[in-house]
């Protein structure tokens, strides 16, 4: 039995092609994935992300609990609304999930975690929180809409109240604020400016329609995937999972090694991996000739081999790009098995497009 988001009827109205996405009926596209992709890069597009899981953590030990739970350090968060991206690890240093944490106070935080990992995430939160004076509350009374693109903020502003516009004016990236009934955050998964808006379920369809009327194009999971891949952003389950260290997934920047006294789950394994440089690394791959780099393809480098974790045709660049996990010794080029022959690809840092422009 698949679940439906509160915006299901709006997707059907817009002619969406629906697919089963980890138990949720979600739009893969509304007719043209490439047009939806380009709308986000050049103007404004919106995604139904109501399948994401919102969890509020409250209590006198909320900060201590999160300092144990995640690899990044929530003590860095001191300004209300500031957000932090972090992996949540198992004892072997593998990634249970990646998530965003919003800081309200030292006793109140909000987590946004992936839909595909909801059951195991909630079970893990329940298990670890048992040792702390905290409450863990799933907020399934909300929907969520991501509005992304160079004109996303301006178009959103046209349908907010004066008070709401004042509350978000000049808000830096990776912040969120509750204003009226909406929680509006300057986060996203596209490499563009925009907002992620948490809205009470009963208001979600109206907000979606207002955004449509303001000229924001609906975009499906297909465009969401090509946009995040161009931006070099990981997709859980493909680019990392419980068997993959964050050090092998371009996530070293999300690990707070100091203070050394903070004993987060998985720390000892990561410290050893960092010391002996034992993990693979994540790189970007670029194929400027014909062909599409595909997830699961073998990557052959001097002295070893790796694997493409995510690959696609990049509508912005006009050729194929990929994220791959490869040996640390990998140089500037590699070879990929395509149609039973080896094709040479360029090896670059993960990330290909930001704010509509190539960063290669």
From Swiss-Prot:
Gene3D superfamilies: Aminomethyltransferase beta-barrel domains, Aminomethyltransferase fragment, Probable tRNA modification gtpase trme, domain 1. The glycine cleavage system is composed of four proteins: P, T, L and H. It is an enzyme of class 2 (transferase). This is Aminomethyltransferase. Keywords: Aminotransferase, Transferase. It comes from Pseudoalteromonas translucida (strain TAC 125). The gene is gcvT. Belongs to the GcvT family. GO terms for cellular component: cytosol; glycine cleavage complex. It catalyses: N(6)-[(R)-S(8)-aminomethyldihydrolipoyl]-L-lysyl-[protein] + (6S)-5,6,7,8-tetrahydrofolate = N(6)-[(R)-dihydrolipoyl]-L-lysyl-[protein] + (6R)-5,10-methylene-5,6,7,8-tetrahydrofolate + NH4(+). Its EC number is 2.1.2.10. The glycine cleavage system catalyzes the degradation of glycine. GO terms for biological process: glycine decarboxylation via glycine cleavage system. The lineage of its organism: Bacteria, Pseudomonadati, Pseudomonadota, Gammaproteobacteria, Alteromonadales. Disulfide bonds: none annotated. One of its GO terms (molecular function) is aminomethyltransferase activity. Pfam families: GCV_T (PF01571), GCV_T_C (PF08669). InterPro entries: GCS_T, GCS_T_bac, GCST_C, GCV_T_N, GcvT/YgfZ/DmdA, GcvT/YgfZ_C, TrmE/GcvT_dom1. It comes from the Bacteria.
């Amino acid at each position: 039995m698949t679940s439906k988001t509160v915006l299901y009827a709006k997707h059907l109205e817009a002619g969406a092609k629906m697919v089963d996405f980890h138990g949720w009926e979600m739009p893969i596209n509304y007719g043209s994935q490439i047009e939806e992709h380009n709308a986000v890069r050049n103007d404004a597009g919106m995604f139904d992300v109501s399948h994401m899981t919102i969890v509020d953590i409250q209590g006198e030990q909320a900060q201590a609990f999160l300092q144990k739970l995640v690899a990044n350090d929530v003590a860095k968060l001191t300004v209300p609304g500031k957000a932090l991206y972090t992996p949540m690890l198992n004892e072997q240093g593998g990634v249970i999930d990646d998530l965003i944490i919003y800081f309200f106070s030292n006793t109140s935080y909000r987590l946004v975690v992936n839909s595909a990992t909801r059951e195991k995430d909630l079970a893990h939160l329940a298990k670890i929180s048992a040792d702390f004076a905290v409450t863990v509350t799933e907020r399934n009374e909300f929907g969520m809409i991501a509005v992304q693109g160079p004109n996303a903020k301006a178009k959103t502003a046209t349908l907010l109240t004066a008070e709401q516009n004042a509350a978000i004016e000049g808000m830096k990236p990776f912040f969120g604020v509750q204003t009226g009934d909406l929680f509006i955050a300057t986060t996203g998964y596209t490499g563009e400016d925009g907002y992620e808006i948490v809205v009470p379920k009963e208001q979600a369809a109206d907000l979606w329609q207002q955004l449509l009327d303001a000229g924001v194009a609906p975009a499906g999971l297909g465009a969401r995937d090509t946009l995040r891949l161009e931006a070099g952003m990981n997709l859980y389950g493909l680019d990392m999972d419980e068997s993959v260290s964050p050090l092998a997934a371009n996530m070293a920047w999300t690990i707070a090694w100091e203070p050394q006294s903070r004993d987060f789950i998985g720390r000892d394994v990561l410290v050893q991996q960092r010391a002996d440089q034992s993990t693979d690394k994540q790189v970007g791959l670029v194929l400027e000739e014909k062909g599409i780099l595909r997830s699961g393809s073998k990557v052959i480098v001097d002295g070893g081999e790796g694997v493409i974790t995510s690959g696609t045709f990049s509508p912005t660049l006009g050729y194929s790009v990929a994220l791959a996990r490869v040996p640390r010794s990998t140089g500037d080029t590699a070879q990929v098995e395509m149609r039973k022959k080896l094709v040479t690809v360029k090896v670059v840092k993960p990330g290909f497009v930001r704010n509509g422009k190539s960063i290669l």
